């Protein structure tokens, strides 16, 4: 049985009845991480909310006043995951997030159109696709799609949109002769009942459970951004449909305006200007590295030139890297001197190096790391890593001064 959202993809609400409600848990993404959330699985007599399937993400919306967090298909049922319980046999009004739904419809129907044209023009078969949050990707079974072919596919797709081609939804049985003629990647193992066909009139007929536009004119436009190398002998075609094209143009124009202001030139000169800046930065970084190395050597020589230099050397700099610290350690020598070197912000995070007699470093390296709330490792008289509490540096110095006072280090 098809859900109401599949029979009428443009319906935004539906009065229906709660069949069941059971406690459940589900992993939901929040801030890029998946966390297990407790809630309830709700079954309805029918639903206007599309459950995830056919490469299309699920809908969002409300059952009464209760937000629907996920909709998942389980066999013939659409399971609605919600945070609050709903009473069975209760009549409820189900509403969808139309902006999300229509976006998915535009991308999904756009994929059908691009897939059909790529096949009819060049015999490129679609092996999979992904409806992403920002852009969608069609995986084509070919190692190469040329720029000319991309342009031709896009041109024909937009021509069909301008021709106002109708899109029909039909249901057929698996024993219907047409079943073996339509494009398909197979039915789910738990599929039952009629097979749903999305028919773009005169262009394509394809098995699909997703929601689609009723006319290609509702796609507004299609823009193929380009291609990327896919899996072995496959090419990924990146595209946008409908409102996503308008949003992409708006973002691109705002970026162009910002770059024009920053670079003090016109859009046609942006690439050349950025290229010059990158080369200048690379040259400056190279010069800076040379100066840091020279500074490391001079710092070490200055310490060694002091008659009363002692057996402990401590230094902190905001600028530098691991190489800077290791050059100092190499130049001073660690057989008769204990060195504590740090790089970075004095109050937050940075890098550290403890170098000296292996016995001392091996014993106190982990303690230094602990005080600095860092992570690191050591061998051969050196313990280095990253520190999260550089503000604790003074505490480390006190500890190491006590170590020097209590442990005899042979000095030339």
From Swiss-Prot:
Q: Which UniProt keywords apply?
A: Cytoplasm, Metal-binding, Protein biosynthesis, Zinc
- Protein residues bound to Zn(2+): 108, 112, 208, 212
**Xref: Pfam families:** tRNA_SAD
Which cofactors? Zn(2+)
Query: Which PANTHER family does the protein's record reference?
Result: ALANYL-TRNA EDITING PROTEIN, ALANYL-TRNA EDITING PROTEIN AARSD1
Entry function = Functions in trans to edit the amino acid moiety from incorrectly charged tRNA(Ala).
Which SMART domains does this one have?
A: tRNA_SAD (SM00863)
Q: Which family does it belong to?
A: Belongs to the class-II aminoacyl-tRNA synthetase family. Alax-L subfamily.
- Is the keyword Zinc assigned to this protein? yes
Cystine crosslinks: none
Localization recorded for this chain is: Cytoplasm
One cellular component term (GO) for this entry is:
cytoplasm
Q: How is the cofactor bound?
A: Binds 1 zinc ion per subunit.
Q: Please, one GO biological process term?
A: alanyl-tRNA aminoacylation
Its recorded name reads: Alanyl-tRNA editing protein Aarsd1-B
Matches recorded under Gene3D superfamilies: 2.40.30.130, Threonyl-trna Synthetase, Chain A, domain 2
> What's the superkingdom here?
Eukaryota
MF term (GO), any: ATP binding
């Amino acid at each position: 049985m098809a859900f109401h959202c599949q029979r009428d993809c443009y319906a935004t609400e539906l009065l229906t009845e709660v069949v069941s409600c059971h406690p459940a848990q589900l992993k939901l993404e929040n801030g890029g991480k998946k966390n297990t959330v407790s809630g309830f699985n709700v079954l309805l007599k029918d639903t206007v909310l599309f459950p995830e399937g056919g490469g299309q993400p699920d809908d969002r919306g409300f059952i009464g006043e209760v937000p629907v967090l996920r909709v998942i298909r389980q066999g013939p049922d659409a399971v609605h995951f919600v945070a609050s319980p709903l009473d069975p046999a209760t009549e409820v009004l189900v509403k969808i997030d139309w902006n999300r739904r229509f976006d998915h419809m535009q991308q999904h129907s756009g994929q059908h159109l691009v897939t059909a044209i790529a096949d009819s023009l060049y015999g490129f078969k679609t092996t999979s696709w992904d409806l992403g949050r920002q852009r969608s990707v069609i995986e084509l079974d070919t190692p190469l799609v040329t720029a000319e072919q991309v342009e031709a596919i896009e041109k024909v797709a937009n021509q069909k949109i301008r021709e106002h081609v109708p899109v029909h939804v039909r249901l057929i049985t698996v024993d219907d002769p047409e079943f073996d003629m339509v494009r398909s990647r197979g039915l789910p193992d738990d599929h039952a009942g009629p097979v749903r066909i999305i028919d773009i009139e005169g262009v394509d007929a394809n098995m699909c459970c997703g929601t689609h536009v009723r006319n290609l004119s509702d796609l507004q436009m299609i823009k193929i951004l380009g291609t990327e190398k896919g899996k072995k002998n496959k090419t990924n075609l990146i595209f946008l449909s409908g409102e996503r094209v308008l949003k992409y143009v708006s973002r691109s124009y705002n970026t162009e305006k910002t770059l024009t202001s920053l670079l003090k030139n016109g859009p046609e000169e942006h690439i050349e200007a950025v290229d010059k800046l990158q080369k200048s930065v690379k040259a400056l970084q190279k010069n800076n590295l040379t100066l840091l190395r020279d500074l490391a050597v001079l710092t070490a020589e200055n310490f060694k030139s002091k008659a009363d230099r002692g057996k402990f050397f401590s230094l902190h700099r905001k600028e530098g890297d691991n190489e800077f610290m290791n050059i100092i350690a190499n130049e001073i020598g660690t057989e008769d001197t204990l060195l504590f070197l740090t790089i970075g912000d004095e109050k937050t995070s940075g890098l550290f190096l403890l170098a000296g007699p292996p016995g001392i470093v091996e014993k106190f390296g982990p303690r230094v790391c602990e005080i600095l709330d860092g992570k690191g490792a050591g061998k051969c008289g050196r313990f280095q890593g990253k520190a999260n509490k550089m503000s604790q540096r003074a505490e480390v110095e006190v500890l190491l001064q006590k170590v020097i006072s209590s442990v005899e280090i042979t000095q030339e």
